[in-house]
């Protein structure tokens, strides 16, 4: 019979104080010799006595078993096992029975000499007729499912495990291994066609039933069973099982390699509190193939060897609560529907101490149930669309990722569906390629702690949470590079993201993206954003809050902070540097926005520090602001009722604008000093009616710049800090509109062709309450056209 080697195992039944065991090493399948003998079996076997049944040839064994099988159903198993056991073990070389316990009669040696009996006197010498006749011992019978019967040595070998046997008076056979451990054979059935033998028996204490079938598979029924599989186990084919146990407290020690394919099961246990110690490594391939399956609660599986799962197979599957699986060796899972470890039940624990490599649609760990914990101490590599490192469906899941997490090709590193999930990622994370996600959680109240550094590129996403009240703590540094790449993404209300580590966002990537109301982003680390379409922190939702404690550096057309929604608040304490056209440090699209720039801001080469598009915006620039270069802007607001408080000093150079407001009822309070120099430079620029500018700090304008420039009716400027204006085209205060009011309470010094105050409009009022000095050709203190 052609077949792969199946159970390479020791059959060990350790049962409540006594049992039997033998450690088995790998052997190849052996085909025994047998003769073809025509045998006629009695028609009515049921009428034969046990003694008559014993004398039947082996060819009748299947007939005997068929006739007596109904006894098992009705509970009369004793008659069956008593009848068959002794019959089969007395099988001789040609598969006929020999009930005699004595050796068979020696064959004739073909000699013609006839022995001469001695005479009564005893004087004659009997001539020798040749060599002594020596009885030929029967050859061992080898069956194709790795069982050998040696009647000469009175031994039975199962997969290289040798037992001595004894025939009992009740027809059963007693087995004993070299360590003195015992068991009983109750049933022995030979398949003449395939030359295999099936064994069935009990443990020494009668508590456990065991079977070794024609396929070389071990099936055990009973509690407290132990099976030691020292040799290699190969299982191939649908419905094939290497070791099968039905009972509680089962123990399987798999020291040899476990190789499962074709839909078979390597180890299959049904019962609570099972333990499998798999030291020999495991290879599982093909759909429906399972290396280790346990159906029962409180199972423990230890996979110390390396595991290779492919083509839809499953390494370890537990269906029951409170399961623990320890994968201490390396695990490779390759192919769609392939799974390394699968648990269906609550309170599961999976410890992946070895490295895991998940490829082409496979799943490393899959848990379905509440209160699951996965501890990934080893490194996890996930590559390929549909591939997942750790997948949990259930509430209160916990994943501790101590090893490195590397995800590419559209795979997911950690994927959780359920509320109140927690992920502690200490090992660092690298995610690349579209659809790739390092950590994904679908559920409310998720918490993710990324303590290691994160590198996200080429369209990948580091952490994504879809649910309300999520918290993501990025304590390590984060680098996001490439269009559609995202460091952290949350879709849900009341999200909190804490970026304690530094963030570097490049070439179209996004550091943090939140879609939902009442979001908070705390950026304690420095944020660097470079490249068109790049964004450090992006929020779409009302009542957003961003606390930027670290430095904010934006260039190349990127955005540092971008919020769409009403009532947003940004507290920027760390300072801001913005350069290049289209670059914006802080942008808010929505009404009632509040921005506090407590640190210093440096804006250059066409960049914008703060831009708000919406009504009732308030921007407080408490730190110093420097704006340098054409089309560079410190603060820009497009909306009515805007308020800008420049408490720090402002320096505007070479065509830049300190504050620009487009909208009615705007107010600019310049408590700090304002210095404006260069053609096209403007300190404060407002386009709208009813504008108010309170210039409490000094105003110094030169090189053709404008200190305050308002276009609109009913504008009011209160200049308390004094004003110095020099050079042609330089204007301290310019208003284009009717009904303007200017109050210059401080002293004014105008020189070299400059103009102190200019109003172009009707019904203008200018009050110069301080001293005014005008020096030089084309210099003008106050000019009104209207």
Predicted regions, residues:
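Long, low-complexity, polar and repeat-rich extracellular regions
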Residues: 1-786
């Amino acid at each position: 019979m052609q077949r792969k080697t199946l159970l390479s195992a020791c059959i060990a039944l350790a049962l409540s104080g006594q049992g039997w065991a033998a450690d088995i090493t790998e052997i190849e399948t052996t085909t025994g010799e047998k003769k073809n003998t025509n045998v006629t079996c009695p028609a009515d076997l049921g009428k034969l006595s046990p003694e008559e049944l014993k004398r039947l040839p082996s060819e009748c064994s299947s007939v005997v078993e068929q006739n007596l099988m109904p006894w098992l159903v009705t509970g009369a198993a004793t008659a069956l096992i008593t009848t068959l056991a002794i019959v089969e073990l007395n099988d001789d070389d040609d598969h006929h029975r020999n009930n005699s316990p004595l050796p068979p009669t020696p064959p004739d040696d073909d000699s013609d000499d006839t022995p001469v009996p001695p005479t009564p006197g005893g004087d004659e010498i009997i001539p020798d007729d040749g060599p002594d006749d020596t009885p030929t011992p029967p050859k061992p019978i080898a069956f194709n499912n790795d069982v050998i019967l040696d009647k000469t040595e009175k031994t039975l070998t199962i997969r290289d495990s040798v037992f001595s046997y004894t025939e009992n008076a009740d027809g059963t056979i007693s087995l004993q291994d070299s360590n003195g451990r015992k068991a009983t054979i109750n049933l022995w059935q030979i398949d003449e066609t395939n030359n295999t033998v099936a064994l069935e028996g009990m443990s020494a204490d009668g508590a456990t039933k065991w079977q070794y079938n024609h396929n070389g598979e071990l099936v055990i029924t009973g509690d407290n069973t132990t099976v030691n599989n020292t040799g290699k186990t190969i299982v191939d084919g649908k419905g094939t099982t290497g070791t099968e146990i039905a009972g509680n407290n089962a123990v399987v020690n798999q020291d040899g390699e476990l190789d499962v394919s074709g839909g078979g099961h390597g180890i299959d246990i049904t019962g609570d509190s099972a333990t499998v110690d798999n030291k020999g490594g495991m290879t599982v391939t093909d759909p429906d193939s399972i290396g280790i399956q346990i159906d029962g609660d409180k199972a423990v599986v230890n996979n110390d060897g390396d595991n290779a799962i492919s083509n839809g197979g499953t390494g370890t599957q537990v269906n029951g609560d409170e399961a623990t699986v320890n994968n201490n060796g390396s695990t490779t899972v390759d192919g769609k529907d392939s799974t390394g470890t699968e648990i269906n039940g609550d309170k599961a624990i999976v410890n992946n101490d070895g490295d895991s490599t998940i490829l082409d649609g496979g799943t490393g760990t899959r848990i379905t149930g509440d209160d699951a914990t996965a501890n990934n101490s080893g490194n996890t590599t996930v590559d390929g669309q549909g591939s997942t490192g750790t997948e949990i469906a259930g509430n209160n899941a916990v994943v501790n990722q101590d090893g490195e997490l590397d995800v590419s090709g559209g795979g997911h590193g950690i994927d959780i569906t359920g509320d109140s999930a927690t992920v502690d990622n200490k090992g660092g994370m690298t995610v690349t390629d579209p659809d790739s996600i390092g950590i994904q959680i679908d559920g409310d109240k998720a918490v993710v702690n990324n303590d290691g550094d994160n590198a996200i590129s080429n369209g990948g996403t580091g952490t994504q949470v879809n649910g309300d009240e999520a918290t993501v703590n990025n304590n390590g540094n984060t680098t996001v590079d490439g269009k559609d790449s995202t460091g952290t993404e949350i879709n849900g209300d009341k999200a909190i993201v804490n970026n304690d580590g530094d963030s570097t966002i490049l070439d179209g990537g996004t550091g943090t993206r939140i879609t939902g109301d009442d979001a908070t982003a705390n950026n304690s680390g420095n944020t660097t954003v470079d490249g068109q379409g790049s964004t450090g922190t992006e929020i779409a939702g009302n009542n957003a809050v961003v606390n930027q404690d670290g430095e904010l550096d934006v260039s190349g057309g990127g955005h540092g902070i971008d919020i769409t929604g009403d009532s947003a608040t940004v507290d920027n304490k760390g300072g801001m540097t913005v350069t290049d056209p289209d670059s914006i440090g802080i942008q808010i699209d929505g009404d009632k926005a509040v921005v506090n720039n407590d640190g210093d801001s440096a804006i250059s080469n066409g960049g914008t520090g703060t831009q708000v598009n919406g009504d009732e915006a308030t921007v407080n620039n408490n730190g110093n602001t420097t704006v340098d270069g054409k089309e560079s802007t410190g603060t820009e607001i497009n909306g009515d009722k805007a308020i800008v408080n420049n408490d720090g000093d402002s320096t505007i150079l070479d065509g830049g604008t300190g504050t620009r407001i487009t909208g009615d009822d705007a107010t600019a309070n310049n408590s700090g000093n304002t210095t404006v120099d260069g053609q096209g430079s403007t300190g404060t620029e407002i386009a709208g009616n009813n504008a108010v500018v309170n210039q409490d700090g000094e105003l110094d304008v030169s090189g053709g710049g404008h200190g305050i420039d308002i276009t609109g009716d009913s504008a009011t400027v209160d200049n308390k800090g004094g004003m110095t204006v020099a050079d042609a085209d330089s204007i301290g205060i310019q208003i284009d509109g009717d009904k303007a009011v200017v109050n210059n309470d401080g002293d004014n010094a105008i020189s070299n062709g400059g103009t102190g105050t200019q109003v172009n409009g009707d019904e203008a009022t200018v009050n110069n309450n301080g001293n005014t000095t005008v020096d030089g050709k084309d210099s003008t203190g106050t000019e009104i056209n209207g």
